[in-house]
Structures are given as structure tokens and as C-alpha cells.
A protein has these predicted regions:
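Short alpha-helical segments enriched in small residues
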Residues: 11-195
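Short beta-strand-to-loop capping motifs
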Residues: 4-10
Length: 195
């Protein structure tokens, strides 16, 4: 996250803002100066969408960041912390055989987590994360710092992504929550179905 501060008279500020939006408009949070979590809440609220979270390695940090925003109850109703495999199965419906075959930190598991959260919550967008925060855990194929993300959208399928953040636990959790929130900004307003 980068903060840009513009200083000058009103005309210079408007010109600077226009130039900034021209150069990096897709990456600028609205309203200008908003935190990422506030931008997510305002964005979802503006579209009339509800969100849910299914978290493993972040231990509820994504949900915490969303609910730190006043008015977030208008967009956020459900969050699961499913640290253990049993919780992923019992609470989100992740098939035990998928966990056994692929392990908790895998694309099939995180996809099932997001889709389970979407189904159980009735939300429009659900984000799920599962990773090895470290310093322990991980394998040679999936070392500490490996994390899988999934964003399930009621009107647009599920998107998955794997990232590697070799950091201390707290930095890892912050980076994962940041990426998870950014992905929620891809939610789109449901389209009317016509026959």
C-alpha cells in the first residue's frame, strides 16, 4: 500500500489528482484517502453486495479489518476461521478426500472454502485463504510463506491465486489480508437475467 500526498493550491491539487488518476486510476482507492478496508466496504455497499470470509492462516484478520469500518454490517454478515482441517470440512463443506489428497494449503481446498462460504452465507462474494505463515510448517514443495487465495463470486465463478510471502508471521498475515481485500474489489453488480 502506498500513500500519495498532494500539496498545493486548489487548482494544482485538482490537476495533480487528475494526473494521478490518469496514470494509476485502476489502483487508486475511492474515495481518495480511504483505507483499503473502507474502500472495500464502500464499494460493496455501492453495489448492494454482501461479503463473507473463510480464513485459515490469517485467523480472522480479514474479517476484523472489514468490521473495523463503521457501517460494515451493511455488507458483512458471515466470517469463518477454519484453522483445522476438521473445521474446513464441518463448517465449509470441504470434502475430506480433497484435504487428504491435496493438503490444506492448495488450490482445490481454498476454492472449496470460498464456494462453501458463498453457499452457506448467501453472500455475493466470498474470499478464502489458506497458507503457511511460518516459521514452522510447510514442505519443500510448499514452504512457509506459501498461501492460496480464492474469491468466489455469485455472478462470476471462482478465481484462485497462489502467492509466496516469505516474511515473519505478522507481516505474512498483513500481506495476505491486503491481497484478499484487493481481490474483493473485483466483485461486480449482479446482472438481470433475461430469457
Amino acid at each position: 500500500e502506498v500513500d500519495v500526498r498532494l500539496v498545493g493550491n486548489e487548482v494544482a491539487l485538482k490537476q495533480g489528482e487528475a494526473r494521478l488518476l490518469t496514470l494509476a486510476g485502476a489502483y487508486v482507492l475511492r474515495p481518495l484517502g480511504a483505507t483499503l478496508e473502507r474502500a472495500v466496504v464502500l464499494y460493496l455497499k455501492g453495489l448492494g453486495l454482501k461479503a463473507a470470509t473463510a480464513e485459515s492462516c490469517t485467523g480472522g484478520l480479514i474479517a476484523k479489518r472489514i468490521t473495523d469500518v463503521p457501517g460494515s454490517s451493511g455488507v458483512f454478515e458471515f466470517g469463518w476461521v477454519t484453522y483445522a482441517d476438521r473445521a474446513k470440512t464441518e463448517m465449509l463443506g470441504v470434502p475430506a478426500e480433497v484435504l487428504e489428497e491435496h493438503g490444506a494449503v492448495s488450490e482445490p481446498v481454498v476454492k472449496a472454502m470460498a464456494e462453501g462460504a458463498l453457499e452457506r452465507s448467501g453472500a455475493d462474494v466470498a474470499v478464502a485463504v489458506s497458507g503457511f505463515a511460518g516459521p514452522d510448517g510447510g514442505t519443500p514443495e510448499k514452504p512457509a510463506g506459501t498461501v492460496w487465495f480464492a474469491w468466489a463470486f455469485r455472478n462470476g465463478g471462482t478465481v484462485t491465486e497462489m502467492m509466496f510471502y516469505p516474511r515473519d508471521r505478522e507481516s505474512f498475515r498483513q500481506m495476505v489480508s491486503q491481497k484478499a481485500l484487493i481481490g474483493m474489489l473485483a466483485a461486480r453488480k449482479p446482472q438481470a437475467v433475461t430469457e
